[in-house]
């Protein structure tokens, strides 16, 4: 497709030698990925891809539909959302190449339904553009990070190494997602032994982020309530006769929580209208907020021998 590119990333990797007197050795590692041409400015062509495709690279090379290779630079990225925008100078692209490439047509991922037909396009295994087809297997699948989770589109189209950053298209040929991960039997998104479980980032969820990154702006850093603690799951709840939710074990001094009516021992069950079933429900919600915003926390607190409920407003920092 004229709007899809192949990406080759080069990274310096350091490894220790078997012989201690030689010391650490550096070598160049080459990775493959894909990207989607989303817009063109007066001086640059902008391409969206996964952040992990271009993370810590010393050189990024973009290959267009006519196999013309051009260097690119990172315009902006969000590690948390695994999204990056890279830029190619128009002055570096031949006129013949500019004549054949196209901007991707963007669709609305919120209109997707389970069972809808989809097309996945990417640079599978670094061999160049390839196309696979399938259906939407599930929506809003939570893929866990270290301290956060992202809601993903699950698909059964084949997703292999190098497909990351490529386009997920609906039946109209519109981009509705960015192919991002394939899960294997050990739970990683590396080589596959489980088939039919690919994942893509819903495009409508990251439209505003991509617009900001395209301008060279920093990704949102989110905001903080000023609490720490641990989750009370169903098992713990039954064992100790406590409500499920996030148990506050510490309140940071001079934080928004410290200046509110929150107390240690409170159990947060909702943040605004979001049910708190895991800590990621809180951290993901706060990621979209900024300092000065207010949130309402529904909390359970012990009163005598029973728990009562109250709503506390907290100003974020």
Language model feature labels by segment:
Residues 14-30, 78-81, 89-98, 139-153, ...:
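Gly/Ser-enriched beta-turn/beta-hairpin loop segments
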């Amino acid at each position: 497709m004229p709007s899809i590119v192949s990406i080759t990333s080069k990274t310096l990797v350091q490894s220790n030698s078997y012989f201690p007197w030689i010391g650490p050795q550096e070598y160049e590692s080459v990775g493959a990925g894909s990207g989607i041409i989303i817009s063109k400015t007066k001086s640059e062509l902008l391409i969206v891809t996964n952040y992990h495709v271009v993370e810590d690279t010393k050189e990024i090379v973009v290959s267009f539909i006519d196999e013309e290779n051009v260097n690119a630079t990172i315009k902006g990225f969000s590690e948390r959302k695994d999204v990056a925008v890279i830029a190619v100078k128009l002055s570096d692209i031949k006129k013949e190449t500019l004549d054949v490439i196209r901007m991707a047509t963007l669709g609305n991922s919120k209109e997707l339904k389970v069972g809808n037909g989809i097309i996945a396009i990417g640079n599978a295994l670094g061999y160049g553009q390839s196309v696979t087809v399938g259906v939407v297997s599930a929506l809003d699948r939570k893929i866990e990070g270290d301290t956060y989770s992202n809601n993903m589109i699950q698909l059964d189209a084949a997703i292999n190494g190098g497909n990351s950053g490529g386009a997920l298209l609906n039946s109209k040929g519109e981009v509705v997602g960015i192919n991002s991960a394939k899960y294997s039997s050990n739970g990683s998104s590396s080589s596959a032994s489980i088939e039919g479980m690919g994942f893509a980032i819903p495009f409508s969820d990251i439209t505003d982020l991509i617009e900001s990154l395209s301008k060279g702006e920093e990704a949102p850093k989110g905001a903080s309530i000023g609490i720490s603690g641990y989750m009370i799951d169903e098992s713990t709840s039954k064992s100790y006769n406590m409500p499920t939710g996030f148990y506050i074990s510490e309140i940071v001094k001079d934080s928004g929580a410290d200046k509110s009516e929150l107390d240690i021992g409170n159990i947060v069950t909702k943040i605004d209208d979001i049910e708190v079933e895991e800590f990621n429900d809180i951290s993901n919600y706060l990621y979209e907020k900024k300092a000065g915003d207010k949130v309402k926390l529904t909390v359970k607190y012990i009163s005598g021998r029973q728990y009562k409920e109250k709503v506390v407003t907290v100003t974020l920092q």
